[in-house]
């Protein structure tokens, strides 16, 4: 179904998401072996070097053609924070933005156009900026653990689509997926199992792996928002530390935290202290999920 919407837009212009404004020109720019990629200093130089490498790794420089791609981080206060301009002419390409995020999005747009045209980028002028400040993708790793390399692939796809918030669902009923040093049983016991197999070997991220992924996301202007699910869907926690379990019923055993024990709030506070230290995001998602599979304390 998505293709029914995407293909007509790509007939007009192959960039996705559809940019705010496009003016098509004449001719095209060829990504060649003698290509020069330049920045105007600082972050633009760093991004230019990365773009040169990405174009080479994508195998797009088969032609002997020359040309210049310039990345310009400008002080133009008229440009919105994440906005960019991309001007493609037969002999040159200009990427311009007033913020690092905007210039990064211009680079991603150019890569997308280059891959679509297999090294040929048709002449155009694109002026674009996001319609929404929060452009997110959620990944549930409690039910299905993917691992560090797969998460990085998702982050690369997010960057290509100019998404900027990675909502990381790391805890739920099937398993706990983040190392908390103060509570080791969260990973030795709580990380055992997944949605399909409750006895699957423990899988989780160490704190060093979390830091690596957060840094990888930051390089792509993506904020990572972790989720510590509570007070419901706390099964993985409560089977590891049953003293804070609020009980459950039927197949939903240990579904909630116990709301009437001081130890519960001490546990939550200590866990949040470690999570906050790992994630620079101003936001931590705490779920707020249902508690109807619990003891009667929740109804008083």
Cite the ranges covered by each PLM segment.
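Glycine-centered secondary-structure boundary/capping sites
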Residues: 56-60, 242, 300
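Bacterial Sec-dependent N-terminal signal peptides
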Residues: 1-14
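N-terminal leader/propeptide and maturation segments of large enzyme subunits in energy/redox metabolism
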Residues: 289-294, 299-300
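Contiguous, structured surface segment used for ligand recognition
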Residues: 12-134
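Feature activates predominantly on carbohydrate-active enzymes
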Residues: 80-285, 299
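Residues at secondary-structure transition points
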Residues: 45, 181, 238, 293-294
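A mature extracytoplasmic/lumenal domain signature
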Residues: 41, 75, 141-143, 170-172, ...
């Amino acid at each position: 179904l998505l293709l029914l919407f995407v293909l007509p837009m790509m007939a007009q212009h192959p960039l996705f998401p559809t940019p705010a404004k496009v003016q098509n020109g004449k001719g095209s720019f060829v990504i060649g072996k003698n290509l020069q990629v330049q920045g105007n200093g600082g972050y633009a130089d760093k991004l230019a070097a990365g773009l040169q490498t990405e174009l080479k790794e994508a195998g797009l420089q088969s032609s002997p053609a020359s040309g210049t791609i310039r990345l310009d981080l400008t002080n133009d206060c008229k440009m919105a924070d994440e906005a960019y301009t991309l001007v493609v002419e037969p002999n040159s390409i200009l990427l311009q933005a007033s913020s690092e995020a905007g210039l990064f999005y211009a680079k991603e747009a150019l890569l997308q156009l280059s891959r679509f045209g297999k090294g040929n980028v048709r002449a155009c002028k694109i002026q674009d900026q996001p319609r929404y400040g929060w452009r997110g993708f959620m990944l549930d790793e409690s039910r299905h653990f993917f691992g560090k390399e797969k998460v990085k692939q998702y982050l690369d796809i997010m960057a290509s689509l100019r998404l900027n918030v990675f909502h990381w669902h790391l805890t739920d009923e099937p398993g706990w997926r983040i190392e908390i040093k103060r509570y080791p049983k969260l990973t030795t016991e709580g990380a055992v199992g997944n949605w399909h197999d409750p006895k699957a070997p423990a899988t989780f991220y160490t704190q060093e792996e979390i830091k690596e992924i957060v840094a990888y996301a930051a390089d792509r202007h993506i904020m990572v928002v972790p989720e510590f699910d509570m007070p419901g869907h706390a099964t993985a926690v409560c089977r590891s530390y049953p003293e804070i379990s609020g009980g459950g019923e039927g197949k939903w055993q240990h579904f909630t935290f116990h709301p009437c024990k001081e130890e519960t709030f001490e546990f939550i506070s200590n866990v949040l202290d470690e999570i906050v230290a790992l994630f620079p995001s101003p936001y931590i998602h705490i779920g707020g999920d249902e508690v109807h599979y619990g003891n009667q304390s929740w109804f008083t």
